[in-house]
């Protein structure tokens, strides 16, 4: 039967939490659409009105 590698020492809470310190989620950067004043992502087409950079790109 094959032997599997196992941890020699228990990982402390401090080491475990330090490893996970970069796992946090970031909130999306929402801006106001200048056409319909709805919320939209920066550098993306507005999902409410379909405008981008002052012109209609998507028929909504």
From Swiss-Prot:
Annotated binding of Zn(2+), by residue: 33, 36, 46, 49
Coiled coil feature spans: none
GO annotation, biological process: translation
Compositional bias ranges of the Basic residues kind: 1-23
Region (Disordered): 1-34
Annotated keywords: Metal-binding, Ribonucleoprotein, Ribosomal protein, RNA-binding, rRNA-binding, Zinc, Zinc-finger
Entry cofactors: Zn(2+)
Cofactor note: Binds 1 zinc ion per subunit.
Keyword rRNA processing on entry: no
Disulfide bond sites: none
Renumbered zinc finger spans (C4-type): 33-49
GO molecular function annotations of the record: rRNA binding; structural constituent of ribosome; zinc ion binding
Gene3D superfamilies documented for this protein: Single helix bin
Example of a GO cellular component annotation carried by this entry: large ribosomal subunit
Function in brief: Forms a cluster with L17 and L22, and with L22, a pair of 'tweezers' that hold together all the domains of the 23S rRNA. Interacts with the antibiotic troleandomycin which blocks the peptide exit tunnel.
HAMAP family: Ribosomal_bL32 (MF_00340)
Record's subunit section: Part of the 50S ribosomal subunit. Contacts proteins L17 and L22.
Family statement: Belongs to the bacterial ribosomal protein bL32 family.
Designated name of the protein: Large ribosomal subunit protein bL32
Native species: Deinococcus radiodurans (strain ATCC 13939 / DSM 20539 / JCM 16871 / CCUG 27074 / LMG 4051 / NBRC 15346 / NCIMB 9279 / VKM B-1422 / R1)
């Amino acid at each position: 039967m094959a032997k599997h590698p196992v941890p020699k020492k228990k990982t402390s809470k401090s080491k475990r939490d330090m490893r996970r310190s970069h796992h946090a989620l970031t909130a999306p950067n929402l801006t106001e659409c200048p056409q319909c004043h709805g919320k939209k992502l920066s550098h993306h087409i507005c999902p409410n009105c379909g405008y981008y950079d002052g012109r209609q790109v998507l028929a909504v």
